[in-house]
Amino acid sequence: MEGTTLVVIEHDRGALAEASLEALAAARGLGTRVEAVTVGADADGLSDSLAAHGVSVHHRAHHEMLSDYAPEAWGEVVAGLVRSISPRVVLACGTDRGNEVLAQAAARLDLPFAANCTDLSPGDALSMTRLRWGGSLLEDATLSAPVWIVSVAHHLFEPSEAPTECSTVDVEAELDPALARSRVIARVEREAGVTLSSAPVVVGGGRGVGSPEGFAPLADLAAELGGVVGCSRAVTNNGWRSHTDQVGQTGTRIAPDVYIACGISGAIQHWVGAMASKNIIAINTDPQANMVTKAGHAVIGDLHKVIPAITEEIRRRRAS
């Protein structure tokens, strides 16, 4: 495929976001020249990292309105760059920020936008498979437009290096102050430690856990495995755990090496958040529960007996 793919990069404190490394891998798969745009502060030192992942040109957008995330202003910058360099494809990872910025840019360019694609096949038009209805189905579609604006589903494309020479171009954006409708008024540091989105192991609990106190054995197992505790929406709705622990369409989408789902029925909105897990183990008394039928492995039994037994066996083997 000829032409250029422009990748919208997410970064934080001088480091590329893992999501953007996934987007760069997807862009290289199209067979085009890959260029990237960074918007906001702390992007000056990213060219070497971008070069390591196959980027030929790094466009750095500068403006006082871009120091913090403002979707309207960021979308205007991307739209202006598209008008200037005429890429064939504009691509980002389908995070909240990636989808929001591409939607803003597409609206300004009067072009269609296809979000959360799991497969891209270029030709005279762009054939794609994408997640629909919160991930409950996969849709095959074709995008015909002068510029293809797409995001790729998070956690589905494996980052990999492809070193190349990268030049840097500064983009002096001209922005209307009216675009500054959003501004950051404070930043709150997350407590140090493994996060739900990055943990190698997640032990999730649902309504079947029974109470806030019922999560203690799950926390013990998670600690033994070097992981964290997650939960279903039913748990947060009951006030048993914080929304920050929720796995699902309206919570966090996870992709651990192992997800242990305890007492979780497997409603579609939860499955959307967990389906990228490499291995899923369900523990449930109901052999017909959705999570049990979709899991790679299942234990049919009372989680209050099964979880402590697993934890004890892990400790016994480590001690021997």
Where are these regions (language model features)?
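N-terminal glycine-rich FAD/FM-binding segment characteristic of electron-transfer flavoproteins
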Residues: 1-320
